[in-house]
Structure formats: structure tokens, C-alpha cells
């Protein structure tokens, strides 16, 4: 395939790769029952003036996931003609496909509109070190266009210490860090909102809230009603079925405070897989590929197993712990 691309991408099917054109939003059809994968990995050629931030804004991708999918590429000057992987193929998060699901480990939100067979997915900025985003099951309790911002005392103190004192209230407008719209969550003190900055989406940059591109939060504003459930999880390893095959998508694990975790990754991936009883029976697993996927943490779904009655994959074996 393409020699610069991450090693595990050699296991991606050609059908999962396509040449990309600009998209307005990642609105994708839900897969059939028993299937878990949406979208396709896309490839573009960078223009001279492109940065990962520009490309991410155009394709609803965050900075961290762009970096992970394109190791070795300069995020601020990829270079004209450089092939860029767009990680726009996703394994849906585990659990009910309803309301909003936020997966901290992938800096991404999924929204399942009621009564429609589609899912919307958007990149997020999450809480930075010392200001972790919560793991919770909550709901949208209010929607506010053109919000003002009343900085909490802790944030005012932080800014004052940096020589950047904040007013008691920041009015609505282009300088407001909440952007043009906010959703208030039932978990006290937490919001989903826009931004007054071009950068920071798909990164650990907020004070615990969830920051979106302004066009994305405005699109959500027109779709998401008050009362919508919001499930916040932290799952770096997602397993999914597609066409009778099992796929793994790996991201850098984060601890409960949103910092990169020192967890035993092999144990964590086995535990995540064992939670999916529907996929762990009668499989032939390619453990070499599993190790590659876990090591790469590039956010790309990769085939790791087939039913035991199918043609065996290279280095395959029945389900065993990673040793």
C-alpha cells in the first residue's frame, strides 16, 4: 500500500480507503444490527498551506486523532502533495446507541438522533491536566444561544496568576470562550460548548468542559433537545464486528483525570475484549496484529480476527491472553 502509512494499515481493506472530498459534517448511516463500524478511512493530498488544524476543521477531525493517524508528518507543514490519512472510520462505542455518547479516550462525541437511522460524530476538546472531564451518565438540562460566561473563582485565580485577569462576566460575542452556543449538563459545572479559538479541538485544553468547533455546536443546537441522555465513557480499546470479522480500534489510554495512563495496555485490551461476549467465541485471532494495533494507537479500526471456520489469518490462534 502506501509505505509511509502506519504498519497496521496494511491490514485495512481497500474498500475502507477512499480519496476524500470536503464534508459538511460526519453524518453516517448506522450499520445493520450486529454490526459496529461506520465510515471509511480517507486519504487526501495536502496543499502547501495546509496544517492539521485546517484539515481537521474541514473534515470534522481533531488535532490528536490527526497526529495519531499520520505519524512522522509535520502537523504544521505537511508539505504540498503529502498523503494524509483522515481517520473517518469508527467503531461505535459500546453500550446503547441512543442520545449522546462521549468517549474521552478518542476525544469524540457521537449523537444518535431519536427515530433516525444515522449517527453524527464530532471531535471534542476535553479537560487538560488538573481539570479532568468526568465519567458520568447525565443529560442535557438547558440550551443557551449566545451565552455569557461567568468565570468560576478557580479559573479567575489561575488567569490572575498568569497576569491575565478576567472580568466577572464575559459578554456574548467573538471573545467569549463558550462560543455561540452552550449545552448545560446535569453534572454540575460541566458544559458542551463552542470556542473563541481556532485550535484546541481534539486536544486536552479545557477546564473540564467539552469544546467543539463552532459550526459543529451550532449544528448540534438544531438537533439535540433538552432531556437528551449524555453518557461519558473512557474506552481506549473498542472492538467491533463488520462482515463477520472482528476489528480493534486503539487510542492512547487516559486515566481518571484525563492524563495519559500507565495502565498495562495488554491487560486492558484483553479486559475490553472480554466485555464483548458476542465476539469472543469461536474466533481465530491474529495476535501479531493485535500487538501492532495496541502499539500504534492510531485510532484506525483494523481486522484482528475471523470466525474459526473461516480461512485462518496469518499467526492466528484460538482466543488466548496476550503473552
Residue ranges and their predicted role:
Residues 47-76, 118:
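LysM (lysin motif) carbohydrate-binding repeats in extracellular/periplasmic proteins that recognize
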Residues 223-239, 243:
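A short beta-strand-loop micro-motif that forms or neighbors metal/cofactor-
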Residues 26-38, 63-99, 230, 236:
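Extracellular LysM carbohydrate-binding repeats and other cell-envelope/extracellular binding modules
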Residues 90-198, 219-222, 250-251, 256-322:
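Gly/Pro-biased beta-strand-loop elements
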Residues 20-22:
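N-terminal signal peptide c-region/cleavage motif recognized by signal peptidases
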Residues 1-12:
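Bacterial N-terminal signal peptides that target proteins for export
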Residues 206-221:
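Short beta-strand-centered segments at strand-helix junctions
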